[in-house]
């Protein structure tokens, strides 16, 4: 069966945590445009869905998310959980509570619920040995999740995300997006992974990778995500002449 044949069948139900964030919302919106996949969102509170969304939403406390996953039995969990330094009150422990402990806990709960595959949204520069707090936390999360034992683990490391947020754009981030087109061409090739990337491309990549079944651990930089996003579009867009 080809990927296009697969897309013509019933949508694959993919679980998602982090639906209120930029990537999570784009995953819901983009998946709703085709019949390749359907998002089953799990959140702590009700949320307003993007216009035209076709998805299921479960509202439950985080300690019950594993039970939801066990009931849904998706082939893949997409984890886009994350907070900001500002929302965390510029407190390291508060930041770790969401970006590290909650991420690892839900990943473990998914594995315990027999969800075989995980797509994790991390960040460019993630490194457990980094002197930078943010990069170090992301690297530690990647290391912990890698040890859980998923059949397939996809780790996405996007650079600065471009896309509409819900009134939560930090000043430095806004400036970065404005000046990125001018600065990025001047950066050495080794910093290409830090370049900005459209949130839609990351969401498309996450959806496409969530449908893959080959076992293993795979880390995706901006270029790899763009390729995966292209594969998703090829999967869902009608063939020329259809």
Predicted region positions:
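SDR active-site strand-loop-helix element
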Residues: 17, 42, 80-81, 118-124, ...
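A short, basic/flexible loop-to-alpha-helix module at the beginning of a structural domain
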Residues: 1-9
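N-terminal Rossmann NAD(P)H-binding glycine-rich loop of SDR-like oxidoreductase domains
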Residues: 9-34
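NAD(P)H-binding glycine-rich loop region in Rossmannoid oxidoreductase-like domains
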Residues: 14, 55-105, 109-112
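N-terminal Rossmann-fold cofactor-binding loop
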Residues: 42-46, 61
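Conserved Rossmann-fold NAD(P)-dependent oxidoreductase catalytic core, especially the SDR/UDP-sugar
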Residues: 22, 89-140, 147, 151-154
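Oxidoreductase cofactor-interface core, primarily capturing Rossmann-like NAD(P)-dependent enzymes
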Residues: 34, 128-236
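Rossmann-fold NAD(P)-dependent oxidoreductase module
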Residues: 26, 30, 109, 144
